[in-house]
Swiss-Prot record:
Name this polypeptide is given: SH2 domain-containing adapter protein F
Record PTM Phosphotyrosine, positions in chain: 64
Organism of derivation: Mus musculus
Alphabetized Pfam families for the sequence: SH2
Residue ranges of domain SH2 in the record: 138-233
Protein modification: May become phosphorylated upon binding to PDGFRA.
Length: 238
């Protein structure tokens, strides 16, 4: 063997022994940028390290080092608060569906609805049919047709009042505001001492019974078949 080849072989053997003597690292050494010099003031302080946190992350930096078990309780509380807020924000339709209708008592006639009421008819304000006509809030006595229209002018559609008839002292008039204007319907007294509304209504014992009946039913009057007596116009007392 030539001297050059023997020297090369000895160098390779020596290098392999040194490599085997050095233990391999378990983890890779993370990259750390070298200091690029002193600060602009020349005080020898290193440049501040750049933050590697995401720009849109609002969490404090120390949360990145917390294990999942530490943050799990905080996340659970956040979900619980959000769930409670959504339960408190119920929509009107959902809240109305959840309400139970009030139980009717035998001693409270105002809580009972009239039998035979049309389901599609809107409900007007309740009228006590046993109360005398003079004590009803919607009875205005001897006022003219013009005065009745002036009272109804600022009211909503289906507002009404009852007044004395200007042509017959034994009859009354029902003044009603419709979408087309004002309507004046006669409440006539029959020979049997009953009262009828117009020409197509059944007889009633009193005018308050008529108002109570048509507060939940359609009026039998041409041009007002779609309407009910919904909003009484109360008399003004001084």
């Amino acid at each position: 063997m030539e001297p050059y080849e023997a020297q090369k072989m000895m160098a390779e053997i020596r290098g392999s022994k040194e490599t085997a003597a050095q233990p391999l690292p378990l983890y890779d050494t993370p990259y750390e940028p070298e200091d690029e010099g002193a600060s602009p003031e020349g005080e020898g302080t290193p440049w501040p390290r750049e933050s590697r946190l995401p720009e849109d992350d609002e969490r404090p930096p120390e949360e990145y080092d917390q294990p999942w078990e530490w943050k799990k309780e905080r996340i659970s509380k956040a979900f619980a608060a959000q769930f409670e807020g959504s339960e408190n924000c119920l929509s009107p339709g959902r809240e109305e569906k959840g309400r139970l209708p009030p139980r009717l008592s035998a001693g409270n006639p105002k809580s009972a609805k009239p039998l035979g009421m049309e389901p599609s008819s809107p409900l007007g304000e309740w009228t006590d049919p046993a109360l005398p006509l003079e004590n009803q809030v919607w009875y205005h006595g001897a006022i003219s047709r013009t005065d009745a229209e002036n009272l109804l002018r600022l009211c909503k559609e289906a507002s009404y009042l009852v007044r004395n008839s200007e042509t017959s002292k034994n009859d009354f008039s029902l003044s009603l505001k419709s979408s087309q204007g004002f309507m004046h319907m006669k409440l006539s007294r029959t020979k049997e001492h009953k009262y009828v509304l117009g020409q197509n209504s059944p007889p009633f014992s009193s005018v308050p019974e008529i108002v109570h009946h048509y507060a939940s039913r359609k009026l039998p009057i041409k041009g007002a078949e779609h309407m009910s007596l919904l909003y009484p116009v109360a008399i003004r007392t001084l």
